[in-house]
Amino acid sequence: MFITFEGMEGSGKSTALNRVQQVLLDAGHGVLLTREPGGSRLGRTLRSILLDLSNDDIVPEAELFLYLADRAQHVGQVIRPALDEGVVVLSDRYADSTVVYQGYGRGLDPERLRELNDMAVGGLWPDLTLVFDLPPEEGLRRAMTRNLREGTSVSEGRFEAEHLAFHARVREGYLTWAALHPARFRVVDATRTPDEVFEDVMRAVRSVLSAPARP
């Protein structure tokens, strides 16, 4: 079972992901928690390039292929082996982030990005993708507060530094992409309390866990 958590910066997806992991572990499931970029050894190097605030001159096409390289390595080295062992894989971001951020956000063709991602991951798409939705102003406020608290404003603050219009396009991109793929996506209202959000998340997770396994 492969479940991905998507959304803007500061949407609360990482917090929910950790809570889901604990519930599944308590229920006896094997669980792998991972993230993009940075879910493999190579990916950690790429993450330091992609998220560093000082790398503000990366052109959209170069950014795209760095993410695709991270993802191909992540799937081949981490995700597929875990799925082959029957482990539930929970990933903080995956291919849909590239479709939305580089497509709707940067202006590249979303459908072409889906095709490139499909090649990078060998056709491996999630069983469930949760999109945590909230206004970009609120998400940025939360994300900047977190980065200041954790001291990552420079090392992981490149997207938080983007102008508000970019984040508005990202939000609309997520909602548009989710509407185009309703069988896999669930949109979660992330403006509510963490407990209310988590109730919705677990409802969706339990639904997909109880469904017949895909071939």
Curated annotation (Swiss-Prot):
GO biological process: dTDP biosynthetic process; dTTP biosynthetic process; dUDP biosynthetic process
Keyword Lipid metabolism: no
Top EC class, one word: transferase
One GO cellular component term noted in the UniProt record for this chain: cytosol
Residues the record lists as binding ATP: 7-14
Pfam families attached to this UniProt entry: Thymidylate_kin
Catalytic activities: dTMP + ATP = dTDP + ADP
One term of GO molecular function: dTMP kinase activity
Top-level taxon in the UniProt lineage: Bacteria
Gene3D superfamilies: P-loop containing nucleotide triphosphate hydrolases (3.40.50.300)
Enzyme Commission designation: 2.7.4.9
Keyword annotations: ATP-binding, Kinase, Nucleotide biosynthesis, Nucleotide-binding, Transferase
PROSITE patterns associated with the record: THYMIDYLATE_KINASE
Family: Belongs to the thymidylate kinase family.
Function: Phosphorylation of dTMP to form dTDP in both de novo and salvage pathways of dTTP synthesis.
Protein name: Thymidylate kinase
Originating organism: Nitratidesulfovibrio vulgaris (strain DSM 19637 / Miyazaki F) (Desulfovibrio vulgaris)
Lineage: Bacteria, Pseudomonadati, Thermodesulfobacteriota, Desulfovibrionia, Desulfovibrionales
